[in-house]
Amino acid sequence: LQRGRALKSCSIRVSSHRRYGFFIYSPMIFYFSGTGNSEWIANQLSKGQNEDLVFIPEALKNEALEFDLQKDEKIGFVFPIYSWAPPEIVLRFINRISLKEYQNQYLFFVCSCGDDTGLTQQVLVKALNDKGWLCHAGFSVTMPNNYVLLPGFDVDTKELERIKLANAVPRLTEINALISRREKIFSCHEGSLPFLKTRIINPLFNRFQMS
C-alpha cells in the first residue's frame, strides 16, 4: 500500500489569540491524501468554495485542533477510501478537533474511491454525530486505482485511468454546485456487499496494517 507522500503545505488562517494552549483557526476544508487523488479534489473544492485547506496530518502534528466557526461557514472533509471506509487518521482527527461556535453549519464530505465506498457514509456520519455535528451532504468521486490495497487487486490500466480522470472533472463541477447551494444530499456509490466490505474486511485490513 502506497501512502503518505509529502504534499504541498496547506494555507491556514490563524486568529490572533490562543485558548487552552492551542491555536484557534478559522474553519476550512480538512483533507487527507495518500497518493494525490484527494489532494486534487480538495484543491478543486477550495477554489470552488473559496475556502482554505487544512492538511490533516499537519494539523495533528502541530496540535492545531481548535477551529473558530462563523455563522454561515461551510465545513468540509476530503479523504480517500481505504478498504471501504475512511482512513483511521481521518476518524482520529474528527475525534480530537473542536469546532468553536458550532451552530449546525453546513457540513459535507467528499471521498475518492477506485470503484465503490462500502458503508463509508455510515461510518463518517456516525463519527460526526458522536461529536454532536450533523452531516448535511456526502459525495464520492471515482478516481484511478493507483495503489494496491489487498491481494487480488491491481492498479488501473492507463485507458481506465484516463476515463476516470475525464469523468472526475464534471463530477467535481456538479459537487461544487451542490455544495454552493448547500444542498442536503448524499451521493456515494456503495457498491455490492457493502456490509461485508466495511464491517468485516476493513477491520481486518486495519489490523493487518498495524501489525
Task: State the predicted function of each range.
Residues 25-29, 35-40, 44-60, 69-208:
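FMN-binding flavodoxin-like domain, especially the glycine-rich phosphate-binding loop
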Residues 211:
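Cysteine-centered iron-sulfur cluster-binding motifs in ferredoxin-type domains/subunits
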Residues 63-65:
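Short acidic active-site motifs
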Residues 2, 17-20, 25:
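Low-complexity, intrinsically disordered or signal/transmembrane-proximal segments
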